[in-house]
């Protein structure tokens, strides 16, 4: 039986931590673990997901919940409430629903104070890790039988009805993910016609029906070339010389978005080496299975520009194709021949590897994310198969693996700090401090211990890194990468908790550490007034024309984001109230400029585009929270009036909101089909309207929304898992299972706190 371990480093000599592994979450399999009843509970959850996999595609993330609720001896003792047709919501009924949710959320907290969760959904995360272990000869040790069984379960359970796999679990089938998952099944032991429900044969038919793997996007071409299923001649060049360009050039890596930089860093190393893994009998079979013509007859030069229409979200501009062709025809032949291969290429490869080692060390070999992790790990193995760097990478592989009722997948990294920041704020909004004091104290401790205490090591600016001291990451302290909205939410938590008695919630954070957080936020505001996420924005927007991926948008340079801006305004307004003397003028200017950015980026229909959640509902909640914190109201701010109109217009008949993930790639509001509502979207919209003062004008829409949330609450006090709610890079969705626990409760807590409600009459006898 699978068991989640919390804050454990294990006995591996190649793993280390900056804070004794606080927030670390890893899974282990115990063949003798669990009672027959507990095993039956897991089997039932798996069967239920499988039977309903085409109706609700995100998992409920139930395995760790079963374990933690059992360990914490949780049993919901507060009776459920429902609101009938025509019935008013009373303060008492709202309180009951909030208490049930708060007690359940408290029971889900782990010993170190955080809330674990899957954060996955993209179907291209896991296969490259399997490829890497296959190439390096560590497949059996990293993925023994039970691991393989769960990986295959995940692949089977998320195969679309047409036989393919989408870019993410709710998406239409794509060549990229269908080919990757097909190869993954074959590496894990399935035959050409093997797999549950004829998975392999159906996938291969989909691939052939859509032109074969020559039509896989550029990232797929790279991985297939590394495996030896493709030829490097079929990939566009990724010259490592990029890393020795003069810094004044506009396309210098220092000007790139950090994730783009850290993907192409190891990719360019592997490309520069023209590395190819062992050509095994399986690789030769795959060459026969995946193409629509004999491998020897493939026109690799033509294949470079081929991409299946199902994968094509961002078509390459002509300028970009001309650049690739120039590099392919003229530059690469020169750089791969003497003397340039010795004078230039070797130096470029050495510099590239220096950057890879730096990024690995400063993230404790977690690396910035899962795509980058696998590429950097493979690059380290190519450099030295027996080196310590590769061994340190292997020690951190378990940090990325997650097991749910739908099988084992690879996390993007972790959302420990992100989820904890919102969970603590939601719990604070309940005003049930005495009932949940231990939960708040543990959450406070986790947040304080997770703050990044230092900047990246050494001369970090020469390694294209920004300050991180005082920030919070998305996951844990070891990860090391500052994020503006994570920092803002962490800062808000510490400030709010500092206003409560320390004997209840623990000692407040030292002012100097709060000042460090403020410094990070101030450093990330752009000239436009908006906040970037990881590093300062400012590179030329035209560089996006060089976006080499076909399925993402806006990935080349850092941008400003509505959510980061809204979060930062709220945090700094509260900080200014509690510490009025610290950098007063700078903070006032920051808030004024950030408000201007929010007003300038509002769309014509009154909404804001959400970059990290679905989508206009999500962005509008953050924007309205920021504007309200800065003193803007319905009366004095046209942007708020327009936003209120948008939210009221999109409310459903049942009182809820439901927005399709298609809003994100299409960049227009798309409602869920069938007039469905989603409790998480409803919570965001309800809180947005409360920020906008809707209770003072007409509370009826708020009552309708609250009724839907209350009536959707489950027996244990949580809410059902519905559609996927997270997104990144416009076109790929992320699954945040904790959102269904946090946001409906938070919205009800704000509703109970800020909307006047009648009390139930007391009958005197």
UniProtKB/Swiss-Prot annotation:
Active site residues according to the UniProt entry:
485 (proton donor)
Question: Reaction catalysed by this chain?
Answer: (S)-2,3-epoxysqualene = beta-amyrin
Is Isomerase a UniProt keyword of this protein?
Answer: yes
Q: What is its EC number?
A: 5.4.99.39
User: What GO terms are given for molecular function?
Assistant: beta-amyrin synthase activity
Gene3D superfamilies this protein is in?
Answer: 1.50.10.20
- Which BP terms does GO give this entry? triterpenoid biosynthetic process
Q: In which tissues is it expressed?
A: Highly expressed in thickened roots and root nodules. Detected in roots, hypocotyls and cotyledons of young seedlings.
Q: A single Pfam family, by name?
A: SQHop_cyclase_C
Per the record, the pathway is: Secondary metabolite biosynthesis; terpenoid biosynthesis
Induction record? Up-regulated by methyl jasmonate (MeJA) and down-regulated by gibberellin A3 (GA3).
Mind telling me which SUPFAM superfamilies this protein's record contains? Terpenoid cyclases/Protein prenyltransferases
Q: Might you report a single GO cellular component term?
A: lipid droplet
Q: What class of enzyme is it?
A: isomerase
InterPro entries assigned to the protein according to its UniProt record, in alphabetical order: SQ_cyclase_C, SQ_cyclase_N, Squalene_cyclase, Terpene_synthase_CS, Terpenoid_cyclase/PrenylTrfase
Q: Which family does it belong to?
A: Belongs to the terpene cyclase/mutase family.
In its UniProt entry, what is this protein called?
A: Beta-amyrin synthase
Source organism per UniProt:
Glycyrrhiza glabra
Q: Tell me the lineage of the source organism.
A: Eukaryota, Viridiplantae, Streptophyta, Embryophyta, Tracheophyta
């Amino acid at each position: 039986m699978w068991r989640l371990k919390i804050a454990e480093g294990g006995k591996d000599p190649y793993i280390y931590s900056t804070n004794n592994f606080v927030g670390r979450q890893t899974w282990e399999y115990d063949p003798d673990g669990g009672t027959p009843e507990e095993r039956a509970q897991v089997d039932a959850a798996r069967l239920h997901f499988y039977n309903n996999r085409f109706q609700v595609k995100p998992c409920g993330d139930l395995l760790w919940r079963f374990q933690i609720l059992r360990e914490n001896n949780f049993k919901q003792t507060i009776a459920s409430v429902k609101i009938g047709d025509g019935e008013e919501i009373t303060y008492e009924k709202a309180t009951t629903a909030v208490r049930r949710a708060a007690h359940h959320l408290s029971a889900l907290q782990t010993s170190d104070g955080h809330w674990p969760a899957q954060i996955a959904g993209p179907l291209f995360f896991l296969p490259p890790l399997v490829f890497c272990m296959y190439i390096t000869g560590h497949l059996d040790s990293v993925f023994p039988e039970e691991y393989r069984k769960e990986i295959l379960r995940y692949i089977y359970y998320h195969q679309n009805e047409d036989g393919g796999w989408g870019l993410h679990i709710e998406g239409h089938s794509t060549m990229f993910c269908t080919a990757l998952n097909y190869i993954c099944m074959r590496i894990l032991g399935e035959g050409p016609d093997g797999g549950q429900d004829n998975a392999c044969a159906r996938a291969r038919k989909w691939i052939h029906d859509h032109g074969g793997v020559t039509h896989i996007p550029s990232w797929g071409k790279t991985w297939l070339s590394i495996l030896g299923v493709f030829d490097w001649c079929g990939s566009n060049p990724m010259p490592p010389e990029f890393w020795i360009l003069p810094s004044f050039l506009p396309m210098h890596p220092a000007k790139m978005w950090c994730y783009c930089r850290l993907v192409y860093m190891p990719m360019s190393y592997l490309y520069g080496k023209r590395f190819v893994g062992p050509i095994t009998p399986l690789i030769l079979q795959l060459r026969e299975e995946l193409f629509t013509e004999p491998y020897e007859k493939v026109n690799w030069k033509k294949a470079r520009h081929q991409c299946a229409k199902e994968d094509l979200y961002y078509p390459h501009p002509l300028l970009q194709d001309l650049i690739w062709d120039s590099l392919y025809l003229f530059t690469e032949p020169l750089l791969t021949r003497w003397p340039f291969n010795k004078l230039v290429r070797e130096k470029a490869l050495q510099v590239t590897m220096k950057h890879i080692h730096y990024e690995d060390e400063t993230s404790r070999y977690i690396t910035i994310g899962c795509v980058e992790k696998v590429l950097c790990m493979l690059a380290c193995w190519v450099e030295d198969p027996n080196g310590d760097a590769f061994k340190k990478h292997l020690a951190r592989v378990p940090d990325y693996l997650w097991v749910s009722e739908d099988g084992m997948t690879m996390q993007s990294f972790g959302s420990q700090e992100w989820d904890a920041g919102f969970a603590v704020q939601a719990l604070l909004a309940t005003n049930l401090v005495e009932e949940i004091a231990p939960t708040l104290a543990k959450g406070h401790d986790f947040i304080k211990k997770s703050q990044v205490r230092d900047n990246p090591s050494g001369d970090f600016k020469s390694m294209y890194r920004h300050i991180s001291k005082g920030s919070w990451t998305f996951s844990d302290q070891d990860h090391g990468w500052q994020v503006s909205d994570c920092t803002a939410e962490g800062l808000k938590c510490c400030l709010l908790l500092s206003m409560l008695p320390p004997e209840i919630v623990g000692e407040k954070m030292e002012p100097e550490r709060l000042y460090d957080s403020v410094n990070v936020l101030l450093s990330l505001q752009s000239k436009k007034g908006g906040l970037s996420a990881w590093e300062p924005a400012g590179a030329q927007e035209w560089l996006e024309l060089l976006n080499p991926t076909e399925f993402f948008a806006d990935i080349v340079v850092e941008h400003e984001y509505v959510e980061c801006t809204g979060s930062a305004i709220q945090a700094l307004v509260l900080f200014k109230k509690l510490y009025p003397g610290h950098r007063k003028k700078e903070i006032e200017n920051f808030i004024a400029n950030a408000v201007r950015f929010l007003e300038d980026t509002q769309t014509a229909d009154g909404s804001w585009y959400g970059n990290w959640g679905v989508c206009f509902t999500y962005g509008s909640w953050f924007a309205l929270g920021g504007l309200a914190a800065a003193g803007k109201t319905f009366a004095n701010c046209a942007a708020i009036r327009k936003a209120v109109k948008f939210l009221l217009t999109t409310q459903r008949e049942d009182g809820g909101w439901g927005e399709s993930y298609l809003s994100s790639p299409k960049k227009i509001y798309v409602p869920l089909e069938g007039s469905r509502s989603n409790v998480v979207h409803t919570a965001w919209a309800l809180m947005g309207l409360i920020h906008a003062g809707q209770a003072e004008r007409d509370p009826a829409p708020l009552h309708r929304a609250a009724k839907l949330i209350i009536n959707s609450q489950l027996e244990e006090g949580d809410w059902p898992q519905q559609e996927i709610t997270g997104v990144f890079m416009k076109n790929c969705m992320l699954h945040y299972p904790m959102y269904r626990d946090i946001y409906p409760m938070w919205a009800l807590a704000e509703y109970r706190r800020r909307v006047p409600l009648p009390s139930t009459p007391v009958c005197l006898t």
